[in-house]
């Protein structure tokens, strides 16, 4: 597959004749949740069957959407105090037009390999001000269209980014944007008076600078570990029937608690990955699960909020405990850890992050985008509730959605299957020497104990 780039331009917001252009000197400080998130870019790819709107139509829709979501047309820089902030300078979002010399059917399914990185823009943040979002539209020989996004994670989480994608498609179709974007990053997360730090956040969301040394637990950025081990990604498809059987196992033996699809699938994957890695029994392993605070906080954060509202649950067990105990045990660990990240926990985090301790103790975010090998732990990004398949530029919904190639050993991404029947696709990156064992385990239901 050869991709030819024909143009690259900055698309700026178009406000219309009835709306006065706002100031381009405004600065939006990052919230405590933004600053605790990964300082990196995330790329995703949508694919649409023909007929697809012309590039000029997509560009015009993008300009209209950017007028409602100005942060995406801005830059990530610093404010007058030297703190990271979004600069609302209307510099524009990069819009790349490209063509492919093959039909889309000849390369689908798009496997999570380096080849897919040619379908979205690469970030260039070497300067003082970093681009926030980039888009690439690629036309295939058959008329199909791939739309690749690259967006900075410190600006928004998956839910907020998806809302912008929907806004772009709505603006392209000429319909009202919904949900209405909510840009206020200050008033939602004000600390309490007096503050109440009821939970420990050191060593959880924050770590000391001394712990930044990644020495041997790292990767060269190209899917190779410190001693040349190769990271490969396997896409696991869990059918609705398989997931139903996992849930049935949870209630076997008189268990009364019900578990979500996410909890069942993650528990199964956590056990399988631990077995595939061959960890010593006494080794502690944890799974980091992103928890959306929108509905958990009281009052709830509005669905149209444009920033990050995510913290992480981190259930932990020894490898021996995890693989010798029944699946219900892992599910219970996950269930209790996720339930713990409630309104009180989110507010405790806000109070701690604003207490001055982070600055006084020189703490930094534990979310480390440079950490490329997570073993003995895993991290899970669940996109199961994000409406990717509602994106419609006027010619129908996408028939394919995929994350880009991201060779971080142990970083799992869960997606709803495009079939819409309740099945789940999991992208699982592991060292190549662990993958055969993982494949032999992940499609087999655990035995009752």
Swiss-Prot record:
This is Agmatine hydroxycinnamoyltransferase 1. The keyword Acyltransferase applies. The keyword Calcium does not apply. One of its GO terms (molecular function) is acyltransferase activity, transferring groups other than amino-acyl groups. Its EC number is 2.3.1.-. Belongs to the plant acyltransferase family. Hydroxycinnamoyl transferase that catalyzes the transfer of an acyl from p-coumaryol-CoA to agmatine, to produce coumaroyl agmatine. Can use feruloyl-CoA, caffeoyl-CoA and sinapoyl-CoA as acyl donors. Seems to be able to transfer the acyl group from p-coumaroyl-CoA and feruloyl-CoA to the acyl acceptors putrescine and spermidine. InterPro entries: CAT-like_dom_sf (IPR023213), Plant_Fungal_Acyltransferase (IPR050317). Keywords: Acyltransferase, Transferase. The active site is at 153 (proton acceptor), 392 (proton acceptor). Highly expressed in roots. Expressed at low levels in flowers.
